[in-house]
Every structure is written in C-alpha cells, then in structure tokens.
C-alpha cells in the first residue's frame, strides 16, 4: 500500500534509527515535526519531514490538516482470546469479595477455563475478533496475546491455535505467548501435582507441539505467593533456555516473593505488573535490560496499588505500558485510557506515557526494529487523530476515542 500524508499538524514519536528502547530522562522526549508529511511505500514508512520538503510525486494523498500522526500503540500484555465474560464476579467484588477469595471459590481464571473448555476455535476467534476490531479503532496496531485460560494441554493448544487463526485474519500484528502457569486446576491437584510439578508437566506436554506448529514466541507464568512460586519459575527459566522462547513473567502483583530478582538474573525480556515492589526488586531492575511493564487499568479495576512508575524511571529502568486486557481484572483494551491512567495515577508525563505505549511496548515484544516509532523502513502502523489540540491531549481527555483512523501496514482500517 502506497500513501502520502500531508499537512500533518504534528508528527510524533520520531526516534533515531536503531533506537531499541527509551529509559531514564530519554523516556520524557517524544520528538515531533510540526506541519509535516509522511510517505508510505509497500506498507513501510519511506520518508517524512516538514512540508517545505514534501516531494511532488504521484502517490495517493491524504490531507491531515489539524490532525496529529504517531505510531500505532503496541500493547505488550493482553489476554485477548478468552471465552465469555465475568461481570458476575465484578458484582461479588463490589460486595466485598477479594480477587483471591473469588479464585479460591472456583471463580477467576478457573471460571474462564471452564468456558474455554466448551468453546471451539471458531467460537474463540469470533469473540476475539469483535474485541480486536474495537482495539484497532482505538489505535492499537500490535498486541501480545497470551494463552493461560486452558489449564490443560488440549485447551492451551486450542487457545494458541485460535490466536494464530485470529492473527491470520487480521491486519493487526498479534504476538502469541504460552502462559504455561496461570492457575492450578482441580484435575492437577487430584493427581497430586503442586505448582512446580504442574508447570513442568504443562511445559513438557505443550512445548513440542508449540515448536512444531510455531504457536508461541514467548513463555509466561503467574509468579505469586498463592499461585506459582519460585520453583515453578525455575522450570520456566529452564524451558526458556532449552526452547529459545524468551520469558515474559507476571510478577509482584500482590506479593513480592523474589520473582523479579530471579527473572532479571535469568534474562527475562519483561516482568509485568509490579504493583508491589521491594528495594531488592527495584535494585535488580535498575539499569537492566529486562523491561518493566506496568498495567494501570488492572490496578484501577481491582482497586490495588499502581506500579511505581516514577521510581522505575528514576532508577534507569525501561518502562512499558500495556492493558492486561482480560475478563477478570482488566476488561478493557483501550491504550488511550491506559496512557491517561499512567499520567493521572502514576505521575508519568504524556511524553513518557506515549513512548511507553509505543516504542517501549515494541521492545517488550522484541519488535522495536519494526514497530513503535516513526523511522524510515519501519512498518507503516500509524494513528491519525481527530482534530484535537495536541498529542498530549490523548493522555489528558479520557472517555472519548480520539483516533480518527488507524493505518496498519499502510492500509487504513
């Protein structure tokens, strides 16, 4: 697809070629060109600059007067493919039940797993397609999608095959992750498994097929006191080393049990959640190459603390933002709202939030060579805003979709 965007009010997210991620004070710079143009050739960004340098050619042209253009959002942590909804649990929480109490009573992840077990791949894809179309309308161009609601080999592979089928149908880029350790199901307990032995079983049973069918690019586990502890994490680390699939770990959502330190030492690509942080965990992340992915919409929905964005940024950590889109703890995938929450609740600046939701999100998926910033040769995954005053307005005014159109691979969606 070839296209030229002209008269862009501001073109934002321009970072030097080869920039993998942004950390520290660099995160606070979202470079822009005012009154700009951008050309797309064969689905890639081929040129951009001020309108005074705009080439005269035969490319189809779109006038972006009074509109801003920036990279499409990269949501590096989601559970987009699931069955059914869980609003009944929302009602229970409003009456005082905690996330852990609902899970102990067979709700939560186990509830979703029961619904997945009775759903076909086609049904899972159909439900997820509706959600994905809404996300694209709100500006998401790339998103990681985890399994984890199967809880046995058959249904985990079903979810991963559904993610693959959805990716084949969509212009968005979906990045599949095998969430091998999400909750300990009743059948595993009946067979005498604990969190560690179940994790090893799931890895041993699923990884050969995952590799044969190219069903996942990352491994994940829910490392928490009442879910999967450090012995389970060690099995994930070993499997990552043997399979070549990098680690992305849920950790420190409710308790700090040392998972961050262990994941960083093992070279995990990202550690996600981080609502509860100790000095030891912060020290482990300081200056490391493991990306700290914060999920403010989960904190909002569950009423738990927000991740310490300012501390992480000031400690030279690479910070990304993502939605955690899932039916239980974050039933929404609008990255504009995530950016607003990051500013209002975690005191990130709009520039920091936009970088964390684009380039650093891409880095958390090993995709920053293709996605997340304006650079020649990158995929033409772009947002065109409505006629809003500034790019910062995306993070300021919430509750309204400020995206006029999303361009993916050079094609307007």
Q: What are the language-model segments listed below?
A:
Residues 64-127:
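Metal-associated gating/positioning segment near the N- to mid-region
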Residues 136, 203, 211-212, 241, ...:
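Non-catalytic positions within long, well-ordered alpha-helices that form the structural scaffold/packing
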Residues 112-127, 133, 141-257:
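Metal-coordinating catalytic core of metallo-dependent amide/deamination hydrolases
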Residues 401-413:
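Short peripheral tails and domain-boundary helices/loops at the edges of structured domains
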Residues 8, 38, 43, 66, ...:
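Divalent metal-coordination and catalytic microenvironments
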Residues 3, 51-71, 75:
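Active-site metal-binding motif and surrounding structural segment of the metallo-beta-lactamase
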Residues 246-247, 256-370, 385-387, 391-392, ...:
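Active-site-adjacent C-terminal substructures of enzyme catalytic domains
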Residues 1-54, 411:
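N-terminal metal-binding scaffold of metallo-dependent hydrolase/deaminase domains
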